[in-house]
């Protein structure tokens, strides 16, 4: 802090300089500069100030000499006045310094020096010089002043080797660990008391009021006042805490310190405060709740006679209120309008109290709900009920053996010929008590009666007779020998033949009209899993699935010669080419640990219509044809990533469309008009683009396990059946979730199928029934499909919990073919 500038006329130094000879102008200037240098040295060279050059000093000295020569008459007066005022000013400055010392003692400032300190230092030096030079002549004073201010400068100023400028005084300087050559100051530990400005409960952990969970993953719990880490103390488990409470008597007088994360012992004063708080007493032991009352402002001779306020009365006290005027005018307006009738005569009270009048009934509370009425007595509660209400001995014994909670009634009906013979009811008090409990304990709810027309809740659907034709009765039955279970059935594209696959390993072809078996193939490879006719009308191809093998069949003797020739050409062309081998696709189409083999049957089998064998991994469970009749896809759930295979009959090639199957594939289907492929897993249906080889969309079925699937001829709708008795209709233009979910079967659904040309679809279930529905799909995208239930067909028997297994529509006709576990294939006609 730089020293304050010295004022001429008030500072003793200036007076002393003025008392010196006028020729000492330069010495006067040096004296002032010397005092500034001494003050700078005293304050540790904190303010360097601005140095004056010799030229400037000479100019200043010349100016002062000129001023002295210009006004010589003031010099003698100033000398005399200075001598007279010296004693008075010294006394004043002494008083001022004493007062400043008192103020500084009371001050709480802790930082450096202030202006009063500097003035006190200047005043002390001036006082000493004035006391010594009081009786000296002017020449002696001037010589002493010149000698005092003519001092050689200290060359050591500015050459301090200290790097750290830490404040000296409290604490000790130690070398810094982080900055080389620097020093930091360490302070001794102190114990805060009531006289200290800090808290009396100073904690070694200085992290403050923060959540201690921030340190859960760290080995320390905070920092002390010197910045050192406070490591986490050892923590015992619950057993250690229990043993400490049992063995350590001081454990009950300790509390957990959240900052230090350890138990600290409570002092006697703290325990005394806790005991007082438990007893609802004042925590201060020195507090006297019964100290005598000291009447400071009451009692004789202590009354206050002066008013608290002598302000004059406001104007509003004696001026009429305009707000009251507005209220009165509002009442006057209401009287004029007739809304308020003054002096209205009170109603006359009736002379006699009308006991039958309803005038005294008050309106109940808005939340009031009357108690429910007791049910009226029934015929069984009569003292003379009819004979059919009286229990038999077996019913009495059964009623007495039941628990009270399981009994329908709390009494047994009894018969008396007269009312006077009826004894007292022993459960009367118990029933009234339970009634009272229900009245004040059971919550009540108010049910709002809805007046809804029941017809408005039922959708307006056309009558089934308006939607004919559809199958209504079973006309032909195709019985299999031994009532073997028929797993699959299929109809030829011309609607003349029916193919069925049973568990005896035989594929049979039936005449649709008369029910006669016209052809059969015994594949000797276990149960027939699935059969499917090719949709091409130019050929007559049938695919049958058995364990590990696909058989391509054709009843050549039953079809026209040109159809038979086209069928043989299509299936055997690949055998005639040089590239055809018994292992088609081993290195080209199918890549995996197992290869697909296309083999030619024996000569005898070819005469019977067995055209091609395809050996595949796993057991295929479903086959579906492409609309052109050259490609067909099979599903084998137990074949891992080769569960879905797409085969081409003309080239005898097979390929797997999926490198990794997305779940267990249950059913697959080709899109009727686009190169798209549907794959249904247990819960999802995925639509793939075979040309672009990408996933288009995923449909969420909302069922637990998909069992069957079929695609509408338009391609924008599909239905699925599930083992949890649900049928879901998807409108792919609408949403990825089902448009309708129907649950009308009592057991699992086994098969669902659309009619290829008519607006019909059907579903078969293990409950032995087949449900027929009408479905109209509109070309207008703003109109939802119309679904109308038409008929429930019953005829198949349920064997071992299995009913109807498969169904197919007859092309071009409203007829349906179904197969069941009872060994029958039925034709349902309109």
UniProtKB/Swiss-Prot annotation:
- Where is this gene product found? Nucleus, Nucleolus; Nucleus, Nucleoplasm
Q: Which SUPFAM superfamilies match?
A: WD40 repeat-like (SSF50978)
Q: Which classification does the entry list for the species?
A: Eukaryota, Fungi, Dikarya, Basidiomycota, Agaricomycotina
Extent of Basic and acidic residues compositional bias:
131-141
InterPro entries hit by this protein: BOP1/Erb1, BOP1_N_dom, WD40/YVTN_repeat-like_dom_sf, WD40_repeat_CS, WD40_repeat_dom_sf, WD40_rpt
Where would I find the WD repeats? 481-520, 523-563, 660-698, 701-740, 744-783, 799-830
Is the Mitochondrion keyword given for this protein? no
Q: Which GO terms describe its biological process?
A: maturation of 5.8S rRNA from tricistronic rRNA transcript (SSU-rRNA, 5.8S rRNA, LSU-rRNA); maturation of LSU-rRNA from tricistronic rRNA transcript (SSU-rRNA, 5.8S rRNA, LSU-rRNA)
Record keywords: Nucleus, Repeat, Ribosome biogenesis, rRNA processing, WD repeat
Question: Which family is annotated?
Answer: Belongs to the WD repeat BOP1/ERB1 family.
Q: Gene Ontology terms, cellular component aspect?
A: nucleoplasm; PeBoW complex; preribosome, large subunit precursor
Relate the assembly described in the record.
Component of the NOP7 complex, composed of ERB1, NOP7 and YTM1. The complex is held together by ERB1, which interacts with NOP7 via its N-terminal domain and with YTM1 via a high-affinity interaction between the seven-bladed beta-propeller domains of the 2 proteins. The NOP7 complex associates with the 66S pre-ribosome.
Gene name tied to this protein: ERB1
Pfam families linked: BOP1NT, WD40
What is the protein name given in its UniProt record?
Ribosome biogenesis protein ERB1
Q: Where is the composition biased (Acidic residues)?
A: 35-44, 52-109
Tell me if Repeat is a UniProt keyword of this record. yes
Write out the function statement from the record. Answer: Component of the NOP7 complex, which is required for maturation of the 25S and 5.8S ribosomal RNAs and formation of the 60S ribosome.
Q: Where is this region: Disordered?
A: 1-141
Q: Which GO terms describe its molecular function?
A: large ribosomal subunit rRNA binding; ribonucleoprotein complex binding
Where is it predominantly found? nucleus
